[in-house]
């Protein structure tokens, strides 16, 4: 692992066009849920840099404002929070109208509760330049409208979404969002990475071990654990006699541990007495080399075996972690190729313009 002091010194020297270690992302998740007979829809907006939530807005709060969710954001001035609060409130009002509009598109009654979600963001490549952008809408937990990888056109999932697609095309919304994603979003992501570099650019290797859980006299479950790692991207695989064993592997989603790190496990059912034929392989950018684990009986500690896999080099590679958000709908995106960017005005909202009408 790269020495922490050296990493900080290198970070100080980084300019906007210089190389960051690995890729990084800035994403916003906005969710609105209608509440028939109970007033305005509930609206929540959260922002993430890589795997770290750094801002949040909730219109059910006693005093609804965009607030910091990461220590490195607490020193931002009132101008920033006023601007981001206005942007969130504007988006909440547009969502209120959009929920009513979509209910009409689908011929739904006013009695039911419905959910509208909007995710948008940008990603930097290892060279610190724009790599891809994404924007997606979902209605009642299902994809609705997606900005295509070229950031110039939309994909609608049904006839109702085609109405929104046509309205977006008429208003040149794709062009507006492309400008935000390629310019303003990138500039803010650089700023956040600089402000939170001690947290966002650090590597925390996983603590690994294997546990044994008898099922019957004939079978047992081997569970491979990875705990306390950052960033969230990690690979856990089981092998039998050196060959991949994925068909019967149970793999859980990477989960936040509550302390800024993540945890994950992968399990496989094996015949009793054949446990030593199975190995768990762990890959994470915080590890200098992949780790191979075998289960050891209780009388012996679990001993990690450093596995040197030919052609696999992890040193110096940092992969952007998966965004873990408390939202109903989430979809993985991939997009276009990188390019240069122009400097955006800091007066622009980090969230971009408010959501457009559907």
Swiss-Prot record:
Spans traversing the lipid bilayer: 306-329
PROSITE patterns (UniProt xref): IG_LIKE, IG_MHC
Binding site for a peptide antigen 2: 98, 105, 164, 167, 177, 180, 192
CDD domains per record: IgC1_MHC_Ib_HLA-E
Documented effect of changing residue 100 to A: Reduces the affinity for KLRD1-KLRC1
Record note on what altering residue 93 to A does: Impairs the recognition by KLRD1-KLRC1
Cytoplasmic side: 330-358
Reported effect, residue 96 to A: Abolishes the recognition by KLRD1-KLRC1
Description of what induces expression: Pro-inflammatory cytokines including TNF, IL1B and IFNG up-regulate membrane bound HLA-E expression on endothelial and NK cells and induce the release of soluble HLA-E (sHLA-E) in the extracellular compartment.
Family: Belongs to the MHC class I family.
Protein name: HLA class I histocompatibility antigen, alpha chain E
Organism: Homo sapiens (Human)
Gene from which this protein is expressed: HLA-E
């Amino acid at each position: 692992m790269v020495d922490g002091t050296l990493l900080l010194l290198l970070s100080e020297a980084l300019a906007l066009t210089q190389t960051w270690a690995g890729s990084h992302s800035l994403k916003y998740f906005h969710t609105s849920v209608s509440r028939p007979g109970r007033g305005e829809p509930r609206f929540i907006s959260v922002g993430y840099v890589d795997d770290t939530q750094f801002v949040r807005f909730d219109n059910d709060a006693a005093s609804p404002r965009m607030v910091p969710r990461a220590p490195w954001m607490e020193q931002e001035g009132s101008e920033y929070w006023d601007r981001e609060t206005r942007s969130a409130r504007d988006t909440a009002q547009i969502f209120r109208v959009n929920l009513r509009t979509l209910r009409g598109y689908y011929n739904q009654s006013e009695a039911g509760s419905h959910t509208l979600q909007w995710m948008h963001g940008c990603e930097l490549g290892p060279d610190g330049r724009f790599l891809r952008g994404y924007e997606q809408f979902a209605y009642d937990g299902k994809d609705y409208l997606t900005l295509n990888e070229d950031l110039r056109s939309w994909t609608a999932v049904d006839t109702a979404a085609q109405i929104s697609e046509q309205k977006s095309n008429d208003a040149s919304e794709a062009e507006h969002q492309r400008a935000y994603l390629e310019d303003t979003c990138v500039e803010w992501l650089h700023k956040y990475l600089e402000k939170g570099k001690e947290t966002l650019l650090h590597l925390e290797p996983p603590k690994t071990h294997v546990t044994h859980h008898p099922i019957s006299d004939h079978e047992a479950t081997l569970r491979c654990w990875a705990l306390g790692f950052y960033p969230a991207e990690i690979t856990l695989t089981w092998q039998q006699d050196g060959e991949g064993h994925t068909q019967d592997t149970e793999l859980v989603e990477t989960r936040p541990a509550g302390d800024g790190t993540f945890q994950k496990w992968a399990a496989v059912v094996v015949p009793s007495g054949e446990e030593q034929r199975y190995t768990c392989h762990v890959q994470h950018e915080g590890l200098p080399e992949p780790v191979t684990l075998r289960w050891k009986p209780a009388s012996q500690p679990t001993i990690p075996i450093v596995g040197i896999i030919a052609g696999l080099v992890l040193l110096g590679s940092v992969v952007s972690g998966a965004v873990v958000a408390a939202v109903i709908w989430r979809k993985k995106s991939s997009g276009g190729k990188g390019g240069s960017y122009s400097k955006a005005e800091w007066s622009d909202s980090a969230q971009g313009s408010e959501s457009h009408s559907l």
